UniProtKB/Swiss-Prot annotation:
Lacks the C-terminal regulatory region which is replaced by HisZ. PROSITE patterns: ATP_P_PHORIBOSYLTR. Belongs to the ATP phosphoribosyltransferase family. Short subfamily. The gene is hisG. CDD domains: PBP2_HisGs. Catalyzes the condensation of ATP and 5-phosphoribose 1-diphosphate to form N'-(5'-phosphoribosyl)-ATP (PR-ATP). Has a crucial role in the pathway because the rate of histidine biosynthesis seems to be controlled primarily by regulation of HisG enzymatic activity. One of its GO terms (biological process) is L-histidine biosynthetic process. It comes from the Bacteria. Keywords: Amino-acid biosynthesis, ATP-binding, Cytoplasm, Glycosyltransferase, Histidine biosynthesis, Nucleotide-binding, Transferase. InterPro entries: ATP_PRibTrfase_cat (IPR013820), ATP_PRibTrfase_CS (IPR018198), ATP_PRibTrfase_HisG (IPR001348), ATP_PRibTrfase_HisG_short (IPR024893). Heteromultimer composed of HisG and HisZ subunits. This is ATP phosphoribosyltransferase. GO terms for cellular component: cytoplasm. GO terms for molecular function: ATP binding; ATP phosphoribosyltransferase activity.
Length: 213
């Protein structure tokens, strides 16, 4: 019996937006993802299972072969240090922008800026490319609070509508990069199961085109 391929997904916005795309490709989970507590879901395709994990863990599961492929935000991939992944397809879902944000009327302190963010590597890279030295403070949430209480001069975070920034008296100041979710593939799986994985990539590429017309 052929071992099913495993597609790693994270719950939340990406999961909500990938399900319609999978449906266009003719792929449906057998259990209701909204109510099921299973972390491995069967689909109507006997050779494909969905593996539900944390968003930040998707690249690791794929790189080490625990999943053959996965869906991860570009923000997560930019922070992932490994190189065992192919990134063959932009799925054009969960789109937003990675931005520098802060209090628009406040002049930052002289000397080295303090930047609070979850995206340490992306932040350091952005400022290094401009020849600026900054102090990066890693946080795991509530980024908007950091400038308000004096922890940081600026934050780097993902911005969709900007409503949360505005509600806290902040504004986007500089654009770092556009973010969307990508299909990532384990390099070894791509070689060993090339035909099956290539077929899935083509199905998803067609689904993306149909969804965006």
């Amino acid at each position: 019996m052929v071992e099913p391929l495993k597609l790693a997904l994270s719950k939340g916005r990406i999961f909500q937006e990938i399900l319609p795309l999978l449906a266009i490709a003719g792929i449906y989970p057998r259990d209701d993802p909204k109510t099921s507590r299973k972390l491995v879901l069967d689909t109507n395709q006997a050779d494909l299972k969905l593996v539900i994990i944390r968003a930040a863990d998707v690249p690791t599961y794929v790189e080490y072969g625990a999943a053959d492929f996965g869906v991860a935000g570009k923000d997560v991939l930019l922070e992932h240090p490994g190189n065992g992944l192919y990134e063959p397809l932009d799925l054009r879902i969960a789109c937003c922008r990675m931005m520098v944000a802060g209090e628009p009327e406040v002049t930052p302190r002289s000397g080295r800026l303090r930047i609070a963010t979850k995206y340490v590597h992306s932040t350091r890279r952005f400022y290094a490319e401009r020849g600026e030295q900054v102090e990066v403070i890693k946080l795991y949430g509530s980024m908007e609070l950091a400038p308000l209480v004096g922890l940081a001069d600026r934050i780097v975070d993902l911005v969709d509508t900007g409503n949360t920034l505005r509600a806290n008296g902040l504004a986007p100041l500089e654009h770092i990069t556009d973010i969307s979710s990508r299909l990532v593939v384990n390099k070894a799986s791509m070689k060993m199961r090339h035909q099956r994985i290539k077929k899935f990539i083509c199905l998803m590429a067609e689904a993306v085109e149909k969804q965006h017309g």
